[in-house]
């Protein structure tokens, strides 16, 4: 690798989340600010909501008031 063209790597970079959580990592930046982390993300906290949007066929059936028995 060529010398003098790569950014300086910092081993102790503080990552600050909007929820107040902080942790350290390595990066070429001196400080990182993130909006969401593993302490506040719904997937990791277990507070996620499952949304069943349904498919295009279900939307069509609902639009024309059909049921599975009506269609062969």
UniProtKB/Swiss-Prot annotation:
UniProt GO BP: translation
Pfam family, one: Ribosomal_L31
GO cellular component, one term: ribosome
Keywords (A to Z) from UniProt: Metal-binding, Ribonucleoprotein, Ribosomal protein, RNA-binding, rRNA-binding, Zinc
InterPro entries found in the cross-reference section: Ribosomal_bL28/bL31-like_sf, Ribosomal_bL31, Ribosomal_bL31_A, Ribosomal_bL31_sf
Cofactor note as given: Binds 1 zinc ion per subunit.
Binding-site list for Zn(2+): 17, 19, 37, 40
Domain of life (superkingdom): Bacteria
Cofactor field: Zn(2+)
A GO term, aspect molecular function: metal ion binding
SUPFAM superfamilies assigned to the protein according to its UniProt record, in alphabetical order: L28p-like
Assembly information from the UniProt record: Part of the 50S ribosomal subunit.
Similarity comment text for this entry: Belongs to the bacterial ribosomal protein bL31 family. Type A subfamily.
Function: Binds the 23S rRNA.
NCBIfam families: L31, PRK00019.1, PRK00528.1
Name this protein carries in UniProt: Large ribosomal subunit protein bL31
Originating species: Clostridium botulinum (strain Hall / ATCC 3502 / NCTC 13319 / Type A)
């Amino acid at each position: 690798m060529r010398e003098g063209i790569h950014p300086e790597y910092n081993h102790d970079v503080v990552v600050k989340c909007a929820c107040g959580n902080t942790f350290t990592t390595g990066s070429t930046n001196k400080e990182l600010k993130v909006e969401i982390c593993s302490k506040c993300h719904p997937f990791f906290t277990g507070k996620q909501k499952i949304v069943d949007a349904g498919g295009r066929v279900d939307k069509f059936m609902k639009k024309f008031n059909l049921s599975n028995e009506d269609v062969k």
